[in-house]
Amino acid sequence: MYKRNERLNLIRKRVDQYGQVAVKDLAIFLQVTPETVRKDLETLENDKLITRTHGGAIQYNHINKEKSYANKWQKQSQVKERIAKKAALQIKSGEIIVIDGGTTTGRIPQYLNDITQTTIVTNSLKIADELNRAIEEQRIQAEVIMLAGKTNTEQDVVRGHMTNELLQRFKFDKAFISCGSFDTSDCYEFDLEEAHASHIMIQKSQLSYLLADSSKRDAHASYRIDGFSEIDYMISDYAKPQNIEYFNQKHWLQI
């Protein structure tokens, strides 16, 4: 039986070695209950040595820590407005839409007008609020579905197992996704659970749109959402480079 300090050191070593660990695996490895493992993970997270996730933990990286939603909202604001306006034009009456909780996708509701019989699903508290305002102002006729889940107060979203379980029950016409960064083949998010939710949105949609301004190019988000081969359209101020081969010019909607 390991003493507490020994367990903490062993957990840290396994996180460093594998990048992520699961509570159930740690319980077997350390020969303790899952509840004991969760308490150990809470201690390590409070000391900023690991970051807890649903069912486990990942490495703590202060360099890649995501800025708050309010701080991100101000960055590249004019470009994000133009991208969101372009995205809003893709939404038609009668469709079932899903929108994730980014600061670019978060601007879509203010540009929605004259759509009817539309269902819009989101994991963003802010987007749900803005959509309800659009309904009250009679700019749109829509049903808004706010997904359940645990809240990330810094990002104004819900996420986790419950969120993902509910997303699996839908079949969407279109998904509008944001990201923390992108390279020549993939897009990434800062939060593992938010990345997973966005991935499901893409997989459950007939058409998917990635909204990303040029500041996201080669930024430092860590968790892969999806490859560009899985995404149908890119909306960006960034001119399509030759080395991004998955989008033809028609599907790269430059603003």
UniProtKB/Swiss-Prot annotation:
Source organism of this protein record: Staphylococcus epidermidis (strain ATCC 12228 / FDA PCI 1200)
PANTHER family membership: AGA OPERON TRANSCRIPTIONAL REPRESSOR-RELATED, HTH-TYPE TRANSCRIPTIONAL REGULATOR SRLR-RELATED
InterPro entries: Carb_Metab_HTH_regulators (IPR050313), DeoR-like_C (IPR014036), DeoR_HTH (IPR001034), NagB/RpiA_transferase-like (IPR037171), Tscrpt_reg_HTH_DeoR_CS (IPR018356), WH_DNA-bd_sf (IPR036390)
Domain HTH deoR-type: 4-59
Residue ranges of the annotated DNA-binding region, renumbered to this chain: 21-40
Pfam families to which the protein is assigned, alphabetical: DeoRC, HTH_DeoR
Gene3D superfamilies listed in its UniProt record: 3.40.50.1360
Protein name per UniProt: Uncharacterized HTH-type transcriptional regulator SE_1102
Upper lineage: Bacteria, Bacillati, Bacillota, Bacilli, Bacillales
UniProt keyword list: DNA-binding, Transcription, Transcription regulation
Top-rank taxon, per record: Bacteria
GO molecular function: DNA binding; DNA-binding transcription factor activity
